[in-house]
Structure formats: C-alpha cells, structure tokens
Amino acid sequence: AQPDGYTVLMANLGPNAINPAVYGRLPYDTLKDFTPVVLVTKVPLIIVTAANSPVKDLRQLVSLAKAKPGQITFGSAGNGSGSHLAGELLSTMAGVKMNHVPYKGDAPSLTDVLGQQINVALPTSLAGMPQVKSGKLRALAVTSKTRLPSLPDVPTVDEALGINGYEAVSWGGFMVPSGTSQAIIAKMNSEFNK
C-alpha cells in the first residue's frame, strides 16, 4: 500500500505482537512495514475461578500451585493467545508451574472453569465480566497495572502477589504503512484523540 495516509491498519495483539514472535515466517514485519498512529484500546484479562472453588484469592492459587507443581490448570483462548502468554507470565513471575489447557476461544474455557474441569481461566474482561457480575465466577485478579472501575474490589496481579511489573492486556490501535509522512501521522493521531 502507498504510504499516503489513505491505507490504515487496525492492528492488535495477535497478528502484530504475538505472531511475529511465534511464527518464523510471516508476509510482513510489523516493526519494519508499519508505523503506529495511535493506541485506541487496552483490554485487561481477569483471572477467574468457579464461585464455589476453594481458591479464594490469587495468593492462595499460587500457594496451591507451589504445593502441587504442574497439577493446577489454567485455561486460555488457545495456544499462543494473549491469555496463554498471560498465564505463562504469571507462572514465571510467581515461581510456579501451572498446566496450560488451550481452548478455541474464551467461551469454552469459561464453560470448563464453571464446571471445575480446570482451576482457572484468563478471559478478556469483556468475555468474563458477565459471569463475574452474576456471581458464577470469582475474579482473583485483573492483569492490568490498575484496578478496573467495573471491578473495584478485585486487585491487580501485582497487588495480589506483592510483585511489581506484571501486566498482560490485549490491545488495538491504528498503524499506517512505513514511509507515511510524520505530518500525516500527527494529524491522524490528533483526530483520533479528539
């Protein structure tokens, strides 16, 4: 595409950040082929368990995972998904080994955590919120740097575990082809931010 400001890519976490790290060959190089214009959305995940689970908070989940290495399961939206990487990051930063169970999206992982087929799931806040608000799921933590206004009593991972630096969010933004003039990018950014 011509770098003239008339071609705009709606970029997101999967194809523009995860895929380049996971797949050896892609027909594009996000860092070389595109220039960011603006970040328009950040969507945190919620670490959830069934409401009737004996696990009451994230610290208890980590303690259980330390006591039973590899026996605690976390569901994700699929191999290489943002929720998969968020779960692995949690395991690494907490110093535990949890068993990853990949699903084809958030909905099947939520079904299995509700049925206690898995211990926890990491859906996006958009997917998990209805079940949390209805009381069917217990939110253990949010994966953003700050608490969610819609779940003010649910701590961040950092708060729950007393660590620093955990953040795992899905995101969306606009990019243009590399070579687009800075004047066009600045104008687009200004318009998006109005």
Show which residues each predicted segment covers.
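Hinge/capping helix and adjacent helix->loop/strand transition within the periplasmic-binding protein
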Residues: A1-T7, L13, A21-P108, V157-G165, ...
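Cytochrome P450 core scaffold surrounding the K-helix E-X-X-R motif
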Residues: P20, P149-L151
